[in-house]
Design a protein with these regions (language model features):
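Beta/alpha (TIM)-barrel catalytic core signal, keyed to glycine-rich beta->alpha loops juxtaposed to Asp/Glu
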Residues: 57-60, 181-383, 391-396
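N-terminal binding-site loop/beta-alpha segment at the start of enzyme catalytic domains
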Residues: 2-139
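A short, structured active-site edge motif that brings together acidic residues
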Residues: 135-149, 176-178
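Active-site groove signature of glycoside hydrolases
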Residues: 165-187
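Short, acidic/polar
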Residues: 86-100, 152-169, 190, 213-219
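Active-site mouth loops of central-metabolism enzymes
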Residues: 78-90, 145-156, 180-186
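Short beta-strand segments at enzyme active-site cores
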Residues: 106-111, 173-177, 208-209, 326-328
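A structural motif
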Residues: 101-104, 170-173, 204, 227, ...
Length: 396
């Protein structure tokens, strides 16, 4: 990586102290190195908001000849896995159609997200029957495979992928994102080599990772696996991916897809000016995600500092006429190596189409960034507290 890219990583990727000037300079330098960046994306007001929003909607992931274009705001379907309320199949599919009709046409799921893959199969068939070919061409279904700790034989890997293909009713998976629990078991390389072979047979279009750390990503790439992206937890509070991981990604062209970007809903007006230290005084932490990300807040700096962050984000949101979640997502999309950010969808229960689409036209200026960083710099460096990307899932 050249000196410009390294200075960008140091100026904006670590949880050190930043200045608006260094941020703006880094953005200008990095834009010239990244095809996806919109001119003056994060450093000056947009002269044509509509054009900027259109150009900023989609991102091309690639490794060699493998390519996949996705919407930069992805619909996360983990909330179909239980714990967020009962999902009605018909209502869920109608909601998916609404998201796709409004340009939010990339869906992220997994083999273990309850009926997510089955819902996608019903949805994609309705798109084929009821929507114009132009919309079908933009729809993407990204799934994950989280195998048990067994020997990764060719037949086992192939049969597992065939299950997802049948459930999603596609000849080839747009993207298979691979997860592995235990790094001491090198079977992950065997699995990825089999997945690469299946890609060559036309059963998978692109291979990606989820929750892998920087060292394992390096090993995987050195073994010739054509990884296009790594899905990791990344938010204004959790900036770990902007340390070692982003540097390797900039060197190799691998992109980041982020989840936890609105922290399960904690980064929203709902939790502004609340006191969770008093039982029943504030909104209930009544989903697995809210409980998980509240623990992340505690590790980062506590509820009082988090309230200061929410107040700052609210000021920025009011300035631009958007919501706190919209600001939170835009901030992460502007980070080096980030191709897209996930927002969880409670299909048939609630929707965030307006807020999600507002992300594309939002331009955070130097003052906005400076005000946000003044707060986040007070928090702990979670790389030191938790470890690298995905380490939270592998701690003893």
């Amino acid at each position: 990586m050249g000196s410009t890219a390294i200075s960008t990583q140091q100026a904006f990727c670590s949880l050190q102290k930043f200045t608006p000037l260094s941020y703006a300079s880094s953005c200008r330098s990095l834009r010239s190195r990244r095809k996806w960046a919109v001119p003056a994306r994060c450093c000056s007001p947009a002269t044509d908001v509509a054009t900027a929003a259109k150009e900023n909607r989609r991102e091309l992931l690639k490794n060699g000849d493998d390519k996949l274009e996705i919407c930069r705001v992805l619909n996360g379907m983990w909330q179909t896995s239980g714990g967020w309320g009962r999902i009605d199949r018909n209502d869920a599919v109608e909601a998916m159609l609404n998201y796709a009709d409004d340009g939010l046409s990339t869906f992220d799921m997994a083999d273990h997200y309850g009926p997510a893959e089955d819902l996608y199969g019903i949805f994609i068939n309705r798109v084929r029957r009821e929507r114009p070919p132009e919309l079908l061409e933009t729809v993407r279904g990204l799934t994950k495979w989280v195998p048990p700790p067994v020997k990764m034989t060719r037949s086992f890997v192939s049969e597992s992928i065939d299950v997802s293909r049948r459930r999603m009713d596609v000849a080839a998976l747009d993207m298979l994102q691979f997860h592995w629990w235990d790094y001491s078991n090198p079977g992950y390389l065997d699995a990825l080599k089999h997945l690469t072979d299946l890609k060559g047979e036309g059963k998978i279009k692109t291979i990606a990772l989820t929750n892998f750390d920087t060292e394992r990503l390096r090993i995987i790439l050195e073994n010739g696996i054509p990884v296009v992206s790594n899905q990791v937890q990344h938010s204004i509070v959790d900036m770990r991916p902007q340390q070692k991981m982003a540097e390797l990604c900039q060197l190799t062209g691998v992109k980041l897809i982020t989840y936890g970007t609105v922290m399960g809903g904690l980064l929203s007006e709902k939790f502004l000016d609340t006191n969770l230290t008093i039982p029943f005084a504030g909104p209930a932490l009544n989903t697995p995600s809210l409980q998980k990300y509240k623990r992340m807040v505690d590790a980062w700096g506590g509820w009082s500092l988090f309230q200061e962050l929410l107040r700052t984000l609210k000021t920025v949101a009011n300035k631009h006429g958007v919501s706190i979640p919209t600001v939170a997502v835009r901030f992460i999309l502007d980070q080096p190596a980030v191709a897209g950010s996930m927002i969880g969808v409670r299909l048939g229960l609630s929707q965030h189409i307006k807020d999600a689409n507002a992300v594309f036209s939002l331009v955070l200026d130097v003052e906005d960034i400076s005000n946000i960083l003044q707060v986040t710099n007070k928090g702990r460096d979670l790389q030191k507290v938790i470890g690298d990307c995905g380490d939270e899932y592998r701690r003893a």
